[in-house]
A protein has these predicted regions:
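Extended, well-folded interaction surfaces typified by the phenylalanyl-tRNA synthetase beta subunit core
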Residues: 2-44, 48-110, 125, 142, ...
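Extracellular ectodomain segments of secreted/surface proteins
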Residues: 1-2, 280
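TRNA-recognition modules of translation machinery and tRNA-sensing kinases, especially anticodon-binding
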Residues: 79, 110-279, 283-286, 388-571
């Protein structure tokens, strides 16, 4: 969880306190913001600031990772109710986005903040929020990164475009021009973050209409335009990244913090090839709740007016609509997805300590299910064969289940269940088999000394005539110079012997395996799985250069196991 440094004197001013807060008062106030004092304060420094560390207890509220964000929420509990100001005035500034950036770092957002009074303390606070958002929320600048510039040195329109690595400019804190190639090799930030752009021949830069370089995102600002000093009053803030929501929220967090410091926000027009967007976000998001359901969930008897007051303390606007309440919340509240999230805000605003715990009416004791007992027994068998268990996500990339195994996404993959609203294509389908997943896992571990002997036992889901059948499969993958059909057959034979089962092998045309070195596994004339040496073309698709052999078994079809399939539609 993030830890931030604040000044007690500064925080007291931000929340408009009529006195200097004590450490205990500060700790009590920020507890409503899911935070606590992390250390004893140092004495006042030469500028009169008593610094203290604050531990933020939530990872999904990046708007709280600054003194300004904490103060904004605390002011709600102190009587400043409802949504913070989200307004912005239009500016003359535009950013034109080159379509080439889509392949590397496709999203950008920006805002202008005017009328600031920068001193050394405020610059350090600004750097702190920038660093916290870049490292934690932005995943060390991979998902998003923030740049701040002196807007008075920048001419519109700004261009976000791709350039060759031979392109030169003067990076921050350096005196001479350097090529981007040299920045990656010799500049501290280039060495630290250059890997983010390592797969691209060209890299993104920001330049203004007079070809002045603003920055090389997400690596380093330029020395001239990309430097904010105590003489700066008006700044441009931009965020770039690979995830649009992350980029927009990171911008919101910084601009809102500077608004709380007295800055006036102006919007920037982002011109993509196919559309135009205005940032920062200034429209609240909405969700409806039923107060009766909230009270039932929390075990409370709050009136509608009480609930409205609690929500306004948490900086929401509330509108009554018949028996429901329409909640309007800030666009940076990415943690709100469901009425349960709103109930959490109500509970915090009312004070968790006032909620009365109740003993459950039904007392039950849990135990391991028969199917889990059998799965664990099978795991012990495979481990006894010196196989290593791996556990992959049940959501996966459709390419792994199609193109990588030479089955394009068409009728041949109609059993694959797709997610309607995936966050990313990497997790957009539910796995329908395990062996391709193990091959993908193997492709990421080719640097480890061979042989590799891995297995997985887990659920798969198949779409069979619109019935979503959830099954439990077991798969084994052996990779090494000596792994053949014979070695994987020894695993199958040992498995079947320990289960006291007879089985048959029949020829199959499964293209995952080499012709003549593959088979269908049957028990009582019922197909239960497949086995064989992996086809070299499949191995090549995964970037595996060592022979591999594998098997996959549907455990729900083995008669003496208590592992059953179930129809998800009927749950």
């Amino acid at each position: 969880m993030p830890t931030i440094d604040i000044s007690i004197e500064d925080f007291s001013k931000l929340i408009e306190s009529d006195h200097l807060l004590t450490v205990n008062e500060l700790d009590n106030l920020i507890s409503f913001a899911i935070a606590e004092v992390d250390s004893e304060p140092d004495g006042p420094d030469e500028n009169g600031h008593t610094k203290i560390s604050i531990d933020i207890k939530t990872s999904n509220r990046p708007d709280l990772w600054s003194a300004e964000g904490l103060a904004r929420l605390v002011k709600g509990n102190n009587g400043t109710l409802g949504l913070p100001d989200l307004s912005s005035s239009p500016s003359d500034y535009k950013i034109i986005v080159d379509p080439e950036t889509e392949k590397v770092r496709p999203y950008i957002a920006a805002a202008i903040v005017r009328g600031l009074k920068f001193d050394d303390f405020l610059i350090k606070q600004m750097i702190q929020i920038q660093d916290k958002l870049d490292y934690s929320y932005g995943r060390k600048r991979k998902r998003s990164s923030i740049g701040i510039y002196n807007i008075n040195m920048i001419s519109s329109p700004i261009h976000y475009k791709m350039v060759d690595r031979d392109f030169e400019f003067t990076p921050l804190n350096f005196e001479n021009n350097m090529s981007i190639k040299d920045i990656f090799s010799n500049h501290p930030k280039g060495i630290e973050f250059g890997h983010i752009l390592s797969k691209s021949k060209k890299v993104p830069i920001l330049v203004d209409s007079e070809e002045r370089v603003l920055s090389l995102p997400p690596i380093i600002n330029s020395h001239d335009v990309g430097r904010v000093t105590t003489e700066s009053k008006d700044v441009l803030i931009e965020t770039t990244g690979t995830d649009k929501e992350t980029v927009l929220i990171a911008l919101d967090c910084v601009t809102q913090a500077l608004r709380d410091r007295g800055g006036a926000i102006e919007s920037v027009e982002i011109i993509y090839q196919s559309n135009i967007e205005i940032t920062p976000q200034n429209t609240p998001k909405e969700i409806k709740i039923n107060p009766k359901i909230i009270n039932s969930y929390l075990g409370t008897t709050f009136t509608n007016d009480q609930i409205i007051t609690f929500l306004e303390r948490r900086r929401h606007n509330v509108v009554k609509i018949e028996d429901e309440l329409l909640i309007k919340y800030a666009p940076w509240r990415k943690d709100i997805h469901h009425w349960v999230d709103i109930s959490e805000d109500i509970a915090m605003a009312s004070d968790y300590n006032t909620l009365i715990p109740t003993i459950p009416k039904v007392v039950t004791s849990g135990k391991i299910s028969p199917s889990s007992e059998d799965e664990n027994m099978l795991r012990e068998i495979f481990i006894g064969m010196q196989l290593i268990e791996v556990m992959n996500y049940i959501l996966t990339d459709p390419i792994i289940l199609s193109n990588k195994i030479d089955k394009p996404m068409n009728n041949s993959t109609k059993d694959i269940v797709e997610i309607k609203n995936p966050i990313t294509s990497t997790f957009s389908v539910i796995r329908s088999q395990l062996l391709p997943i193990l091959l993908s896992f193997e492709s990421k571990n080719t640097h480890i000394e061979y042989p590799h002997k891995i297995f997985e036992i887990g659920e798969v889901v198949k779409n069979i005539q619109k019935n979503l059948l959830t099954k439990t499969h077991a798969a084994v993958l052996l990779t090494g110079s000596n792994e053949t059909l014979e070695t994987i057959l020894s695993v199958l034979d040992g498995f079947m012997r320990l289960q006291n089962l007879d089985y048959l092998l029949e020829d199959t045309d499964d293209k995952m395996f080499i012709s003549g070195r593959r088979a269908l596994i049957k028990i009582n004339d019922i197909p239960i799985g497949k086995i064989g040496e992996i086809n070299p073309s499949i191995l090549n698709n995964f970037g595996i250069e060592v022979p591999s052999a594998g098997l996959e078994i549907d455990l729900t079809k083995i008669p003496n196991l208590r592992i059953k399939e179930y129809d998800t539609n009927k749950l």
